[in-house]
């Protein structure tokens, strides 16, 4: 019997949830995704200090003001890591724009264009890049503009069907619903000790998005993310993409128990689902009605924003040291 890792690959594309190139090459996955939290962890590791310093030197040479220099450096760090990761996976890498822009459509568009152009300028293949955009209304609008300009987007921090439908309407390439963070909210909100896989609210949310997309032949791909357990991963076997941490990937490789496909287009087509029409006002109202999605979206933006600020502080200190050496 083959491993659960190999069995899952029959139905789903497996994605490494790490920004560490050295770790990625050991995982055997097709794609990789990063976020500010993962990049911060990598940037703090001694083995990547030369990459960090190169990005800082490059940013300084662009002759911008202090704010522009930080922007240049942060995006260069991402691109450096992304290009290194792509040496070890055959598919795509997802790079994320600054979470502090989450409610500014035009700023997100401009930042994503800069990131994409920098990626290509440094030798990257644009077809192998997904730009991660937060699942706010403004973010989804930005993704729609970017897709029309040939920049593929991964709309992230998806916590309910409303966000997923809005992203599909915007014709984005891919959405990333967060299984584990949904699960965490329900545990915290209701004091439950846990949910069976059959009742897991995070698993159910992704399954609902999958069913809606496949029922109506929506081409936007689904990349389930933020898994807490191997059982959550297996419960979504058949989802287009599964973003899995290195720890859970290793568990899947060691287990040879049979895996059953849980999601399929054929089964989704049989479901009695009605299409939903969304305007901005309807989107905002339905998000307001969903306390979990509203709170987790806001929390996710805060976490990514906070980690970006920590990374900025580290970069600022490096820049100060370089300036002192050159004085």
Curated annotation (Swiss-Prot):
Keyword Metal-binding attributed: no
Quaternary structure, from the entry: Homodimer.
EC numbers, comma separated: 2.2.1.2
Xref: PROSITE patterns: TRANSALDOLASE_1, TRANSALDOLASE_2
Name of the molecule in the record: Transaldolase
Active-site residue list: 132
Functional pathway: Carbohydrate degradation; pentose phosphate pathway; D-glyceraldehyde 3-phosphate and beta-D-fructose 6-phosphate from D-ribose 5-phosphate and D-xylulose 5-phosphate (non-oxidative stage): step 2/3
Lineage: Bacteria, Pseudomonadati, Chlamydiota, Chlamydiia, Chlamydiales
Catalytic activity: D-sedoheptulose 7-phosphate + D-glyceraldehyde 3-phosphate = D-erythrose 4-phosphate + beta-D-fructose 6-phosphate
Family assignment from sequence similarity: Belongs to the transaldolase family. Type 1 subfamily.
Subcellular locations according to the entry: Cytoplasm
EC main group: transferase
Molecular function terms from GO: transaldolase activity
């Amino acid at each position: 019997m083959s491993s659960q890792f190999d069995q899952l690959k029959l139905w789903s594309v497996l994605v490494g949830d790490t920004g560490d190139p050295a770790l990625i090459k050991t995982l055997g996955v097709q794609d990789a995704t990063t976020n500010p939290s993962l990049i911060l962890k990598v940037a703090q590791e001694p083995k990547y200090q030369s990459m960090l310093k190169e990005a800082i030197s490059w940013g300084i040479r662009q002759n911008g003001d202090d704010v522009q220099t930080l922007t240049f450096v942060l995006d260069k760090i991402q691109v450096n890591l992304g290009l290194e990761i792509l040496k070890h996976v055959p598919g795509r890498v997802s790079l994320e724009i600054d979470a502090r822009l989450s409610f500014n459509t035009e700023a997100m568009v401009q930042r994503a264009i800069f990131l994409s152009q920098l990626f290509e300028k440094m030798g990257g293949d644009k077809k192998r890049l997904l730009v991660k955009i937060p699942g706010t209304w403004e973010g989804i609008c930005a993704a729609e503009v970017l897709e029309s300009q040939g920049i593929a987007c991964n709309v992230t921090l998806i916590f309910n069907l409303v966000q997923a439908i809005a992203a599909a309407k915007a014709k984005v390439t891919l959405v990333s619903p967060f299984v584990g963070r949904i699960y965490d909210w329900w545990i915290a909100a209701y004091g439950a000790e846990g949910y069976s896989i059959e009742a897991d609210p995070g698993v159910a949310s992704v399954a609902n998005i999958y069913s809606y997309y496949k029922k109506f032949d929506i081409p936007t791909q689904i990349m389930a993310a933020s898994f807490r357990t191997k059982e959550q991963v297996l419960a979504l076997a058949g989802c287009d993409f599964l973003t899995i941490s290195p720890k859970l990937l290793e568990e899947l490789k060691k287990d040879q128990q049979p895996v059953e496909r849980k999601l399929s287009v054929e089964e989704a087509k049989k479901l009695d689902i009605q299409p939903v029409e969304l305007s901005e006002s309807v989107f905002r109202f339905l998000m307001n009605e969903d306390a979990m999605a509203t709170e987790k979206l806001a929390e996710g933006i805060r976490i990514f924003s906070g980690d970006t600020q920590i990374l900025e502080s580290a970069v600022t200190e490096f820049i100060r040291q370089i300036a002192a050496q050159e004085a």
